[in-house]
């Protein structure tokens, strides 16, 4: 079975729109969508309440990618940003921001305690839910750029993680013919 769960992507795009056009009328109109999305994410992808979210085909690079219920960095980062901005939107439209601010803070704490590998300077791809509950340290590129894009890191973490990419992820050599020779 192959399909995508693009709720995270749609809501992330919607939140970026809100950052550039915080029209209170539109925020109010879309509030139920955001609220129901965050409830759905919590119910389906964080059923144990540890503030670390599972992921199933929820990013563009994720053809048949599933973590078997584990705690996944990229989906957790998206949910951090979703809750953080939901708290800000709630304040603007007169709703209670506390549940969203509390969840965002708990997500960030859980990410730092469980998924951040301090001695290597990057996030783990995920942590197993079952069995030995191993931390999978071989992170994909999206595991680095998503927390940075979502603001789920300190400036030092962002720097260290991008340095880890430079030093550890393989590169595909590309040679291009140009008027001055092969580049």
What are these regions (language model features)?
Residues 28-39, 66, 70-105, 116-120, ...:
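Active-site core of glycosidic bond-cleaving carbohydrate-active enzymes
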Residues 7, 11, 52-61, 119-121, ...:
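Active-site-adjacent bridging/hinge elements
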């Amino acid at each position: 079975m192959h399909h995508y769960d693009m709720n995270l992507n749609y809501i992330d795009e919607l939140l970026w729109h809100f950052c550039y056009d915080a029209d209170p009328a539109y925020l109010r109109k879309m509030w139920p969508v955001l609220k129901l999305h965050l409830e759905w994410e919590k119910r389906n992808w964080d059923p144990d309440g540890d503030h670390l979210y599972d992921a199933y085909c929820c990013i563009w690079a994720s053809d048949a990618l599933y973590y078997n219920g584990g705690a996944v960095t990229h989906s957790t980062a998206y949910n951090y940003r979703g809750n953080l901005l939901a708290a800000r939107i709630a304040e603007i439209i007169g709703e209670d921001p506390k549940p969203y601010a509390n969840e965002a803070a708990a997500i960030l704490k859980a990410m730092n305690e469980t998924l951040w590998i301090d001695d290597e300077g990057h996030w783990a791809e995920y942590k197993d839910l079952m069995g030995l509950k191993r931390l999978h340290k071989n992170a994909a590129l999206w595991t680095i750029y998503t927390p940075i894009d979502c603001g789920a890191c300190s400036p030092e973490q962002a720097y260290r993680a991008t340095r880890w990419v430079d030093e550890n992820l393989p590169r595909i050599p590309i040679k291009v013919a140009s008027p001055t020779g092969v580049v």
